[in-house]
Amino acid sequence: MHFRLNFIPEDQNEHHVFRQKQKEAFGGGEAPVMSVEEALRLVPNLSQFNADEDDEEFDAEGFYSTKLSELSCLTAGADGLSGRGLEVCYEDGAYNVCIGTPSTRADWRIALEYLKNLALKMDGEITSEDGEKFSAQNIEGFDFESDIRAGLANIKRNLEEKAVMCTIYGVRNEVSFDQKIIARIMDAPDPADEFSKFVTDIQNLNAYFSDQMFSGINEDSEIIGRYILPQDIATVLPFEPSVDYNNLQILGGKEVSRWSVAIFGGDEDHCEKYDILATLKYENFIQNLPKDKYE
């Protein structure tokens, strides 16, 4: 079974954390920790994005019965609506709900509804990371619009000062920004709406997002990063390759010396005849793409 986390660490990405203490059990002590299934029931039509349920190794009964205290974090959202979703974890007798900065308007509305229902279920106050208190009656009035504006301004500033590309993580796919994209968002009549649409559309693309593969990791040689491009399948590749956050630990701090694209294909009626047809330098492949194939 494969799990993923969508938010990058605090030193690389800002986020808001809201804390809700666990309810006391009747007669004293803490009530049982919610399972994944119970946590998802707090908001209608909420789905998990930790695991691929189409994976033949996915154990639905085992996963949904898992207590949040046994899971590093539950990534949740509304399929088709969420851009970045929210993360729920349990530690030190409390539920922590994390929302990335910036997140989409739909993400925030779902997260605030989640916090409201969590507060009702736990019959207690919600506390933000800066100590501000909220109740189930007023949490939905949290000013998330200013948080979206601040997050977009931070991306813009990073691109202007040092970064060639800024990347955030969505419920399904990464979202990258360069100066052209962030300028289009910031110049829109409603930047938060433009950002929300951009991020959510990328999560709902009917395309294969190419996975990264690496060679030379366990050898005393250069590390080569590779993207797989299948024949006859709509595939999304980054304009400029960089190591996905989920792969940083695999590399153990080592740098990728070069990137390539491996074109994979063969006879669709005979899977055993599929093979790598060609391997190209990444920059050469991108430079030779027709202009209508990328923005």
Q: What are these model-derived regions, one by one?
A:
Residues 1-295:
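Acidic (Asp/Glu-rich) sequence patches and key acidic residues
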